């Protein structure tokens, strides 16, 4: 029905699609500016409870803003700098939106707020509110009205803090997005021209990609009133929109060319292309959307943003490929064909490769499997961790320079203290609930933990080896509030850089004489990380189940989907391997200019897994559809494999090349995890389209033979009722294709009925 509609009214469909595209561009521009600056925070976690208690009981919180004051001529103890530091602290304290502030120049401030050489010192502040308020409103105003006012020839003032770091990261991601647009679009057009050898199909394919990218951003605008969408979703919409638009358009145009080569006129060829290849595109889109939809499992807006973006991209790519593109095919006619005419698939490279593989499946398949295992071996050393300023590459970013100074010159990082809160606990002299001695012993115990520089509490300030508890640096009133008390556990810079998550666990594991909750910036990052890692098994299970169902509906087999899932997981191990080897261990640091931290941020790796797995299944759908089509036509379980691969592998290779190039553009990003995403995804797509589809798939299908298309009786009946049925490419006239032999007909009927 859709094909007939497009054939009858191609101009109407094309004009409507063009107007939708132009409207999408206009709406997309407003979407990008409205996206959110999400934090790495886990709602409902212990750190969230601590943050709420600090706000409610103490009117303070973990410092999320820091100002580094550097003296140009003397030290921070010089009279002029002391006076300026006091004025700066007062200005920050009084600034609209700031809830609390203190500094090295505050009364009884600890020495850790100054550098070892006394040339730098810190002002810390807590700004309540969500990330958009803090990063979008308070910080820009603080930079313009306070930092720039106090910055002078005598002292240099730099703005930092956790929210400032990721404000800069988000801004850099936006700049990378714009640069990627300028590079990806002409690059894709050139590659498409090399694939098609004609400008018309290249422009049509790029138009579908732009339709998917712009349309997805426009759809996200409809979601924004109901949920937060991360700024990084725009990057995903661009690269996946272009990639899926190219994938689906290549598949449709290749099928159109085959239909014309089989003797059908161009009008009939369009209808048969939509009726046949269009359904495969739909199933492929369902697979990719399902792989990304599992991100809704996570209660983190940063991750659910990519689920919304992925679903929107798939919807727009499928619509563009099955509605707008057929209208172009109908109007362009023979201008969409190869200038030299179609070649025989049997003469192609992939036919020869797959035939060679199937002659010796154990040898070739074993060699391919060994290569995957070797490339994926570094995955065994994967270590999850939390991001910090080092996600910004070395360069001209002041916030990165600021924290390099803090790491090298400061013994501890007060802004990253762990905050231990005991709500509804009266502590102190004369208390009947918790004696002051219990608080004294608990604070002293925390100070003995490896990597703890100092513990501040109402009972005093404790350092390792000092259990006497001298007077607290800010006075007892900062650590007591009515029926509550709190402690500040200050980590050393070395421990914070090496193992912040381990420190959080040790603090939480220390026996306390009263109920406590542990918060602070390191605890928030640890809870976010744990929230992701704990749900990884569920996400993996959901992805496997959903993709199995989609492939079963397409093939009617239980063996082929299982084989595909195993091979896809093996290909993804290569992606994980290069991330660990290149980014966690730093092998690519010199080439790309980032700073390795020895850990991988889990949410980005999870996003990569979902995208790569969905795209792998995308290619698997194309491949299996053509192999099964050949099997249904000939009944030959062996020859159908190279024949199907010969017809699908060229377009899969071309699509993978273009998609890999689009992802690889992000290797030039100034944000480390965008580089990780670009390099890892480019490699995953390249390996999947070559080693997996060209070697391991034909080897596996040769070894499983006719069992590849087997399923139990009840499932066969279910597939007969609801499964995908794609007609083969048949000549327009002449005798029907050779019927399968009698001994294979029952099996074929089960798979093609």
Give a label for each model feature:
Residues 1-34, 98, 129-384, 513, ...:
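Membrane-embedded transmembrane helical bundles of large multi-pass transporters/channels
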Residues 34-38, 387-389:
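Short hinge/gating elements
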């Amino acid at each position: 029905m859709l094909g007939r509609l497009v054939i009858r009214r191609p101009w109407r469909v094309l004009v409507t699609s063009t107007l939708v595209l132009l409207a999408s561009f206009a709406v997309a521009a407003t979407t990008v500016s409205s996206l959110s600056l999400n934090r790495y925070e886990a709602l409902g976690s212990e750190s969230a409870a601590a943050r709420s208690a600090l706000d409610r009981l103490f009117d303070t919180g973990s410092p999320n803003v820091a100002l580094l004051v550097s003296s140009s001529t003397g030290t921070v103890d010089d009279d002029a700098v002391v006076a300026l530091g006091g004025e700066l602290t007062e200005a920050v304290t009084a600034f609209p939106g700031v809830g609390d502030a203190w500094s090295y120049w505050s009364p009884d401030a600890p020495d850790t707020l100054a550098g070892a050489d006394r040339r730098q010192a810190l002002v810390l502040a807590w700004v309540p509110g969500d990330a958009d308020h803090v990063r979008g409103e308070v910080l820009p105003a603080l930079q313009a009205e306070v930092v720039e006012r106090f910055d002078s020839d005598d002292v240099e003032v730099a703005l930092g803090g956790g929210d400032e770091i990721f404000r800069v990261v988000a801004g850099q991601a936006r700049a990378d997005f714009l640069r990627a647009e300028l590079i990806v679009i002409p690059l894709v057009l050139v590659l498409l021209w090399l694939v098609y050898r004609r400008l018309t199909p290249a422009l049509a394919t790029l138009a579908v990609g732009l339709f998917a990218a712009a349309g997805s951003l426009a759809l996200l605008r409809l979601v924004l009133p109901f949920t937060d969408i991360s700024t990084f979703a725009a990057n995903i919409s661009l690269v996946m929109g272009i990639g899926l638009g190219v994938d689906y358009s290549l598949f449709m145009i290749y099928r159109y060319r085959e239909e014309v080569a089989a003797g059908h006129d161009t009008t009939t060829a369009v209808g048969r292309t939509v009726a046949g290849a269009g359904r495969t595109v739909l199933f492929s889109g369902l697979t990719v959307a399902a792989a990304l939809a599992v991100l809704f499992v996570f209660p983190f807006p940063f991750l659910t943003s990519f689920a919304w973006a992925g679903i929107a991209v798939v919807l727009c790519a499928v619509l563009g490929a099955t509605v707008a593109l057929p209208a172009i095919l109908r109007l362009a006619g023979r201008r969409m064909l190869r200038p030299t005419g179609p070649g025989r698939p049997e003469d192609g490279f992939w036919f020869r490769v797959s035939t060679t593989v199937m002659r010796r499946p154990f040898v070739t398949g074993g060699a391919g499997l060994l290569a995957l295992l070797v490339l994926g071996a570094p995955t065994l050393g994967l270590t999850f961790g939390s991001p910090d300023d080092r996600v910004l590459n070395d360069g001209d970013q002041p916030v990165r320079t600021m924290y390099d100074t803090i790491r090298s010159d400061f013994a501890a990082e007060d802004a990253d203290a762990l905050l231990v809160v005991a709500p509804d606990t009266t502590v102190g002299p004369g208390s009947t609930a918790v004696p002051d001695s219990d608080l004294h012993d608990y604070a002293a115990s925390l100070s003995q933990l490896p990597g703890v520089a100092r513990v501040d509490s109402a009972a005093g300030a404790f350092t390792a080896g000092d259990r006497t508890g001298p007077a607290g640096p800010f006075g007892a009133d900062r650590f007591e509030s009515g029926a509550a008390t709190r402690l500040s556990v200050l980590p050393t810079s070395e421990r914070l850089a090496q193992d912040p998550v381990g420190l959080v666990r040790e603090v939480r594991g220390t026996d306390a004489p009263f109920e406590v909750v542990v918060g602070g910036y390191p605890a928030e990052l640890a809870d976010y990380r744990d929230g992701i890692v704990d749900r990884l098994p569920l996400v993996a299970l959901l992805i496997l189940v959903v993709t199995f169902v989609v492939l079963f509906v397409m093939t009617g087999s239980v063996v082929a989907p299982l084989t595909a899932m195993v091979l896809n997981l093996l290909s993804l191990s290569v992606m994980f391997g290069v991330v660990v080897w290149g980014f966690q261990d730093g092998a690519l640091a010199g080439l790309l200019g980032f700073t390795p931290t020895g850990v991988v941020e889990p949410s980005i790796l999870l996003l990569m897994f979902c995208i790569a797995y969905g795209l792998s299944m995308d290619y698997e759908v194309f491949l299996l559809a053509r192999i099964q089509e050949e099997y249904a036509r000939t009944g030959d379980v062996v020859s159908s494999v190279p024949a199907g691969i010969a017809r699908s592998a060229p377009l899969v290779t071309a699509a993978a090349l273009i998609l890999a190039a689009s992802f690889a553009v992000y290797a030039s990003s100034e944000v480390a995890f965008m580089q990780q995403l670009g390099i890892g995804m480019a490699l995953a797509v390249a390996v999947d389209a070559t080693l997996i589809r060209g070697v391991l798939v034909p080897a596996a299908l040769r070894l499983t033979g006719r069992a590849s298309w087997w399923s139990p009786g009840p499932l066969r009946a279910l597939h007969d009722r609801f499964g995908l049925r794609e007609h083969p490419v048949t000549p327009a006239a002449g005798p029907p294709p050779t019927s399968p032999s009698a001994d294979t007909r029952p099996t074929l009927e089960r798979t093609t009925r």
